[in-house]
Amino acid sequence: MSRLDYPAFDCDNHYYEALDAFTRHVPKAMQSRCVQWAEIDGRKRLLVGGRINRFIPNPTFNPVSKPGALDAYFRGKVAGGDMRAMFGELDPISPAYRDRDARIALMAQQGLEGAMFFPTLAVGMEESLRFDVPALCAAFSAFNRWLLEDWGFAYQGKIFAAPYFTLADPEWAAKEADWAIANGVKVIVMRTSPAINPAGGTR
């Protein structure tokens, strides 16, 4: 691989959410309708809207696949198959996947000047909560406040984490945008699909 003679800026970087990403700031009255954790058959399970959610096979992300595990697959160089097998040997989660200072140190090793950071688990939660728009908005209000605390919207001018927006409730989205702008947001993330309506359909 050729090397750049200047630091790169990565527009598609990701983190793995902390276990309390959706729970730290959610109102107590909404907890059972949003995102919770439960111990079931000795395993930590994610409950979304009171149901086991399987969007991510192991939403604790510990252990997790090695970086680039699916590179050959996404480049069309190998056929698909059993996804668990394709992930290969798993590693304990790295501090750099959840701690912004550890990530900045890693970025320096990688030659990155800065990066936009996007969710992993959170991108599947809008679909999971589409039939309960108040819970959907409460969940992402909580998530975005966790994101600001743990990663920051423009941390040290290097980490630009994107809060998640849904248009299921446009009034909520407008207020959330005002809050995000007041906290220095530079980039947001939204689902690439029609907006959900309060009945769970689309606008």
Where are these regions (language model features)?
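Helix-coil boundary/capping segments in enzymes
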Residues: M1-R203
